[in-house]
């Protein structure tokens, strides 16, 4: 499928650099097969039904962005994937200045050795010392903000709170499951009072979620893989909801992709603990998901193709144009949408 069919023009001023405060005050565009309506995330208890099941991703973002020096050369590195007890792959600015066995000093008594530089420009680092790498990153790292924010401003202490969901428990993500950023404990309580239940899965979001498709046809795109887990308890909750006639609504594309990866052809969800590289494009038959809450995505991205698969390309292009025209804020810190195909 031609990637340029999923392109649209987005004004720079539509990109949110900070989240809405309070979180649930973000705007929410509800899109159904019949219409589009403007709400706020705080309206969710009135938009969802008793018996619905929301799925949240409980991954925790690690402070994976590091700035350091090799001699006098400034080096910035985004850790993207763990490769061993002390080794991480990283996207590196000024990677050409690095060679095998170079030592990069990231400050705060944190340094790493260059194992090798990969053909794609990424670098494999091995962190020195005996302290767990998680402690080193917590001490010296910053939140790995998406490129479209990081190019406008550096990460700061506020991002350590803003770029983490209230469900964050299991460390491993280098990007936030951003649809869940809109939820507060108070909103969850109101949803529970309405009879809307929720459960959690884990998918450690990788930096590949921000990579543009560099091909003209989606058939030629190599999808990044991410590790995810669905417990037997969560699988049972999803299957029971479907059995009782309730709707399963994924909060975020990460939850959706994981659930669809764990479902068999009959729509039954099984416990899951593995990598997934599922790539959902128009024509895909959804096995489980009845709806999706998700932020607004980049043009020509795998995630815009995913929402187009759920709702239809023309409808999503029209919805995004409405969002742009009426001042919705886009991307990770932006507003959200509730997509209900039936």
UniProtKB/Swiss-Prot annotation:
EC numbers: 2.4.99.17
Q: Which SUPFAM superfamilies match?
A: QueA-like
**Transferase: is it a keyword of this entry?**
yes
**Listed InterPro entries:** QueA, QueA_dom1, QueA_dom2, QueA_sf
Keyword Cytoplasm assigned to the entry: answer is yes
Q: Where in the cell is it found?
A: Cytoplasm
Query: Which branch of life, at top level?
Result: Bacteria
Which Pfam family, any one, appears in the UniProt record?
Answer: Queuosine_synth
Please give the Gene Ontology molecular function terms for this protein.
S-adenosylmethionine:tRNA ribosyltransferase-isomerase activity
Q: Name one GO cellular component term.
A: cytoplasm
Provide the reaction this enzyme catalyses: 7-aminomethyl-7-carbaguanosine(34) in tRNA + S-adenosyl-L-methionine = epoxyqueuosine(34) in tRNA + adenine + L-methionine + 2 H(+)
Q: Name one GO biological process term.
A: queuosine biosynthetic process
Which pathway does this polypeptide act in?
A: tRNA modification; tRNA-queuosine biosynthesis
Alphabetized, the UniProt keywords read: Cytoplasm, Queuosine biosynthesis, S-adenosyl-L-methionine, Transferase
What is this protein's function? Transfers and isomerizes the ribose moiety from AdoMet to the 7-aminomethyl group of 7-deazaguanine (preQ1-tRNA) to give epoxyqueuosine (oQ-tRNA).
HAMAP family for this protein = QueA (MF_00113)
Family statement drawn from the similarity comment of this UniProt entry: Belongs to the QueA family.
State the oligomer form and interacting partners. Answer: Monomer.
Please give the name of this protein.
S-adenosylmethionine:tRNA ribosyltransferase-isomerase
What organism does this protein naturally occur in? Zymomonas mobilis subsp. mobilis (strain ATCC 31821 / ZM4 / CP4)
- Taxonomic classification: Bacteria, Pseudomonadati, Pseudomonadota, Alphaproteobacteria, Sphingomonadales
